[in-house]
Amino acid sequence: MKMESFEVEAEQEGERLDKFLSIIYPEFSRAFFQKLIKSKQVSVNETPQKASYCVKIDDIVTVEIPDAVETTIEPENIPLDILYEDDDVLIVNKPKGMVVHPSAGHYSRTLVNAIMYHCKDTLSGINGEIRPGIVHRIDMDTTGSLIVCKNDEAHVNIAQQIKEHSVNRIYVGIVCGNVKEDSGTVEGAIGRHPIERKKMAINEKNGKPAITHYKVLERFKNYTYMQFKLETGRTHQIRVHMASIGHPLLGDILYSSGRSPFKHLQGQCLHAKTIGFIHPKTGEYMEYSAPLPEYFEKMLCLLKSNT
């Protein structure tokens, strides 16, 4: 059992207790914290509260996180949006809210559970039992194209392409504010945040080099629709880089200074639109694009109507 305490800051005031904790610990779901709250493993100012309690500035929230237990990852019949498939690779369009592989608080309903059911025993095993077939990841609330490897040979090949930065990865996203330049590049090494352990940050001393190219697709009142091309693939790269220049992604509570005015929006507006790579067996260049999810299309329409 691990116990930690957090002081509520001004920009976090008004959040539900379960949501506040899921922001602090993005690897755990709100349902996970609702169970902890119900079992009185969460307190506010040393007093148990309901999950619906809205935290106040200077509240001290204390949580007891149970020790991780080993679990068997089971195949689950979860529908997949498949963009391409052959004997070596599978390209899927990951939906919003789906974690790529099991982790503490997310032992089921992950992409790994889904691909284990779909592919049976034909998945690479290089990343172990928890991450079969997984050669790269995108965040839980980021949607879009992702490569799954169906054998170890394909996995080694694709992993090398990623290491050499030769995989073409194009994202689209909506950021807060009006980006002045039509295009540009953000360069800044990314590492763990020195204080908030769940966040990444620009860290030139201890971080890894990261480069993000961007292009403005459309401007709205107070928001900008953008395209991003990654040279590197660091954790939360686009989210950290855009926040570092004053334009956090719409809906990204972790890296913005306040809550989104769009109450229905859960998580950042970021979509892995296109992925291109050399096929590990044929040597041919392949490129696939995932259509924008419905929530993203609706958000664009809403922003256009308010311009």
Features from the language model and the residues they span:
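Short, surface-exposed secondary-structure edge patches
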Residues: 50-54, 227, 267
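RNA pseudouridine synthases
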Residues: 1-185, 191, 295-303
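The conserved catalytic core of RNA pseudouridine synthases
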Residues: 128-160, 168, 172, 187, ...
